[in-house]
Amino acid sequence: MRPLFQLGPRLALCAGFVREGTVLCDVGTDHAYLPIWLLKTGKISRALACDIRPGPLETARKDGAKYEAGEGLSFRLSDGLRQVSPEEAKDVVIAGMGGELILRIVEETPWLRDPGKRLVLQPMSSVPELRLGLAEAGFQVLE
């Protein structure tokens, strides 16, 4: 078995906010490092890795196989959460995108308002605009 990698600071911070035992959806997964790491460390048992582009999704699949993530990791070609149903995720991570794009994804996904859902958002830009948009939409911003 290949040794498990260490998450960089940005993804490690996101991992800390994911609830133990949850079902995760990682939007814009790219390499799927976050769901692979969470699965391999036993923090979660299932994850859905989503990306809008086929290339990064194929890279994620290869990484899942390389690190033996197992059947707990599935993959989906999706623009944001458009191809994800509410029962497929309890915690949703959207990291590494601009704040405006994150806000668009959140606003167009009504089921994220369910109080049982947790959003872990890590914007690369437009942080004040994202915070304001989330507050105006009725979301509670914790950190």
Model-derived segments and spans:
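Conserved class I S-adenosyl-L-methionine
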Residues: 21-30
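Conserved SAM/SAH-binding beta-strand->alpha-helix loop
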Residues: 53-55
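Short SAM/SAH-binding signature in class I
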Residues: 89-96
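S-adenosyl-L-methionine
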Residues: 1-22, 36, 58-87
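Conserved SAM-binding motif I beta-strand of class I
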Residues: 46-51
